[in-house]
Amino acid sequence: MKTYEYILSATILLVSICGCARKNAVATAADECEPLFLAVRPLPEGGYSLISLSPFDGSRDTLIISRPLSRLIVMSTSHIGFLRAIGGEDAIVGVSGAEYVYDSTVRARIGEGRILDIGYDASPDYEKIMALKPELVLTYSVSPVKSQFLTKLESLGISTFTVNEHLESHPLARASYVRLFGALTGNMSAADSVLAVVSKNYQALRDSVRALMTVPGDGPQSADAEQRICARKILVNIPYKDQWFIPGQENYLSHLVRDAGGEILGSEPGTSISGQISVERAYSLSKEASLWLNVGWCRTLDQLLSVNPLFGDFLMNIQKNAAANGFGSASGSDSAGSSASVGSSASVDGFVSAGGSASVGGSASREGSASVEGSASAGSSDSVGSSASVDGFVSAGDSASVGGSASGDESTHADGQASPQVIWNDNSRQNAKGGNDFWESGVVRPDLILRDLIRILSGSTPATQLTYYQPVE
């Protein structure tokens, strides 16, 4: 089962040899995904042709689907997230690394023996795989070298298909793989509905932030001409095996942070590949940062300080900068635009308030085909948008201003001065073994991740209103 600590490279997944198939499915996402192409092409006689292009050597993995598949082995928890989003989880008969599965429904089926753990691709249980009689094993690639696992499966006559969504650099491009799973399971209508709503939500949130970052009437956007509300400067990550990675500006996380109104410090322009920095360089960046995101496995400050006691100095630098810029300060002022709010013309949930366009909210659907409605609030249930329900955002009245007043996410020093909450991690939804729903359901719900980040960057939202993130305190 693949897990993610850092995104180190990017990929392109092609679906149609000659054009972009996204136009038929989700017009609103087309501008986000170029020059990416979705790997699903309908066939005249019915079914779909799937084409996956390796970012490493350009080799193609092709598959013809003439009927819905009902027996799948999935080698990544992200595959579970896609299938759950469209109500296709019944097709799962095997997983890799069952202890890292977050979704409670799939975990329950594992406990009942309805879904089996076939082991990891480095040491799989081939007898168990054969006994499951899978119609398809969904794999992923991390290098141009064909794995022994794939070679062995082919020799056993077992069909495989490579899914490289984890290497896509844009959040909506990554989410668009839900259509691939729709093609596999006969749930294309559900997949299109999911992607349409997620794309609409994401773009509305991003556009709300952009409206605050640019003063109307500036004319064509340019770095010199436009007046901007300052992007919040952010330090990300901690050392992983003594290497501190900073994602490039075209990286998945960088897109999310930028669309939320932030700037990752030390990020190299023009690349999605992560670069390495020293702890000393990271300390220097902490003197500029007012927020620290994605601190590895840490859930508490004590755990963070156990990694490196110097991180206490990082924290003081970042808290000082956050307070100086009005983020979560005792006074509640915000030099980055306290009068502007994502909720002023559109709610932070991405929907225009009363009198504007309709909210996507409604009752949650857990049966049958996909519902583009739902009323699940952030983090309120174990499964986000499960069983083909695309939970809509709560509408007006639950907005968080970008640059608003403090809301209690603060600690207090002995001198009585409030310290802003400046360290947040993406492990709010994590099981006892470390299986993280950020990389499971979050892959198909970048709109919810973006909403979290907007609320965090505003410095004015309680942790209870977040889905995937939580404060480290």
What do the predicted segments below correspond to?
Residues 327-414:
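Long, intrinsically disordered low-complexity tandem-repeat segments
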Residues 19-69, 338, 380, 458-473:
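N-terminal hydrophobic or amphipathic helices and topogenic motifs
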